[in-house]
Amino acid sequence: MSSSIDIGISQDQRQQIADGLGRLLADTWVLYGKTHGFHWNVTGPMFNSLHGMFDTQYNELWDSLDEIAERIRALGMPAPFGDST
């Protein structure tokens, strides 16, 4: 009995998709960090609206990080983290 389900995508194709998702995961991680930094450091007359906007954005990015990593795992590949890429 096979431990994986045949979804009609070859191993090579799954690897290519996972590699692309891995790059998306890395880019999203960078954007998450930068957005969080802006949230912490925003000043000025638009502080309240920008602070709230950045809060919403970094929380949504966090959810996206989890979703992207889980999609990589669903393809049967390990989700990259740290120096694993």
List each language-model region with its residue ranges.
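Conserved alpha-helical segments that form or flank metal/cofactor-binding pockets of metalloenzymes
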Residues: V42, M46-S84
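Long, well-ordered alpha-helical segments
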Residues: L24-W40, I68-R71
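Mobile beta-alpha loop/short-helix "lid" or hinge segments that flank ligand
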Residues: H36, S84-T85
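Disorder-to-helix initiation segments
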Residues: S2-L24
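A generic "alpha-helical surface" signal
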Residues: D19-G22, A26, G52, N59
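Helix-loop segments that flank and shape redox-cofactor active sites
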Residues: G8-Q16, L31-T56
